[in-house]
Amino acid sequence: MHFLSQNDLNINLIPHLCLHRHSVIAGAFTIHRHMKIFNSPSNSSTFTGFILLGFPCPREGQILLFVLFTVVYLLTLMGNGSIICAVHWDQRLHAPMYILLANFSFLEICYVTSTVPSMLANFLSDTKIISFSGCFLQFYFFFSLGSTECFFLAVMAFDRYLAICRPLRYPTIMTRRLCTNLVVNCWVLGFIWFLIPIVNISQMSFCGSRIIDHFLCDPAPLLTLTCKKGPVIELVFSVLSPLPVFMLFLFIVGSYALVVRAVLRVPSAAGRRKAFSTCGSHLAVVSLFYGSVLVMYGSPPSKNEAGKQKTVTLFYSVVTPLLNPVIYSLRNKDMRKALKKFWGT
């Protein structure tokens, strides 16, 4: 019989919903029941999946979390969907900046859909089991969409650089054809970046408890469940995972450094404010996304590492897609007008 270590019982609890003694007891009984399932002889050869612990708490807490994340998911779909429709129907927004924004909003819908529906099913499930194929499909789409988001943020920064630093040549450089090619390349590069390492990890053998202390299939807990360590695969993934994040972040920083230098040369204060206002929304979105990612990769390990990983992942995969439409609509007058027209207000 395989027993849980102290780290396995280090459960991250949602504030105000699961912060009492009964939550811990319920979580312990849940883990104990799952351990029986996985380690019983009758199930060792037939079971093909993992257990996602998610946010362990009593049944009432699970229902409240289900309602909360359902509302967040629907608001995210509505906000990003509104931007897509506004750009599609308003002729004034048929410019590269807004075409990129509409594609980015579609990406955000895909990104949040890769995690939240499975979370909602997990809240209502007694077993909290996810199949091997379901786990690795979520693994692939979550990381591929995250990489695609990094590429899109870099392309949008490049667009702002051209608009401010090369205003006279902008219409001839950022053509509809170039914009389309950039969008396609973002999707293609994002989806091929992690393909080989994820396929290699999926071919490894897993044994032990098969309990993942997360709300999604994350590589860190997955690799700890392998029967035989694969240092080469772990090294490749640990290098490939942060590489697009930091490379594209440096590209964005460099682009905005040139933008700031160009804006500071504008003689009038009104001109400087207008130039900065065109970049403000994108800078806010970049700060939200990369701020949470840098906390994930840059902060030292903590005692409750699993809890930190859940919190940070929840922020940039669920909260950020919810806030992005609000940021773009508040900071952009043309987008506000288009959204008001779309909603008939």
UniProtKB/Swiss-Prot annotation:
Disulfide bonds join C135-C217. One of its GO terms (molecular function) is olfactory receptor activity. Coiled coil: none annotated. Keywords: Cell membrane, Disulfide bond, G-protein coupled receptor, Glycoprotein, Membrane, Olfaction, Receptor, Sensory transduction, Transducer, Transmembrane, Transmembrane helix. CDD domains: 7tmA_OR11G-like. It comes from the Eukaryota. One of its GO terms (cellular component) is plasma membrane. Belongs to the G-protein coupled receptor 1 family. Odorant receptor. This is Olfactory receptor 11G2. It comes from Homo sapiens (Human).
